[in-house]
Regions:
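Short secondary-structure boundary/capping segments
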Residues: 10, 36, 103-105
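A short, compositionally biased
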Residues: 12-16, 61-62, 116-117, 147-148
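Short beta-strand segments
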Residues: 16-50, 56-58, 64-70, 76-79
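Conserved short hydrophobic patches within well-ordered secondary structure
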Residues: 5, 46-47, 137
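Extreme N-terminal tail/first-helix region
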Residues: 1-19, 25, 140, 149-153
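C-terminal edge-of-domain segments
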Residues: 108-156
Length: 156
């Protein structure tokens, strides 16, 4: 099953959580984030406080990775691209929900992280879920490797 970029975006929009990976001085840092989408734009927004380490990391290196994963759906998506910060009220408002009252004391302290993907890689095993357990048992019995499902790289 080959997916178009449009189909990939449809899949991504179904997720309510992901991992945002940025570069710290000497290592990669990952943290769970809630993705937000503005209309049909092919960017992902995240909301954070201006008082987090993510701000300095993004200012020093704009490269980032966003990873979506669903064992239940048999779908894994990795996006590589660039991040930038936006304190534009429209970007913050697009993300703000009541749940952020618990994380960010003052809405004025909120800033949006705008992620623009440049490439994507996904693994789709959704059509194999029913036979995945059998494939695993068979490969153990035969000392072989199971079929991991489909993998595709996309330039965005």
């Amino acid at each position: 099953m080959r997916k178009s970029p449009r189909e990939l975006w449809e899949d991504i929009r179904e997720f309510d959580a992901c991992m945002l990976v940025t570069r710290s001085q000497d290592r990669l840092r990952s943290r769970p984030m809630r993705p937000f989408f503005e209309g049909r734009k092919e960017t992902i927004l995240f909301l954070t406080s201006i008082e987090t380490d993510k701000i300095a990391e993004i200012k020093s290196c704009s490269q980032a990775n966003v990873v979506f994963s669903s064992m239940r759906e048999g779908l894994w998506i990795s996006l590589t691209g660039k991040v930038r910060l936006s304190n534009h009220a429209q970007a913050v408002d697009a993300c703000w929900t009541e749940e952020f009252d618990a994380w960010i004391d003052d809405r004025e302290q909120a800033i949006a992280i705008v992620f623009t993907p440049e490439s994507a890689e996904y693994w789709d095993c959704s059509e194999k879920r029913a036979v995945a357990s059998w494939d695993m048992l068979e490969s153990i019995a035969n000392c072989s490797k199971p079929d991991p499902g489909e993998n595709q790289k996309l330039a965005l």
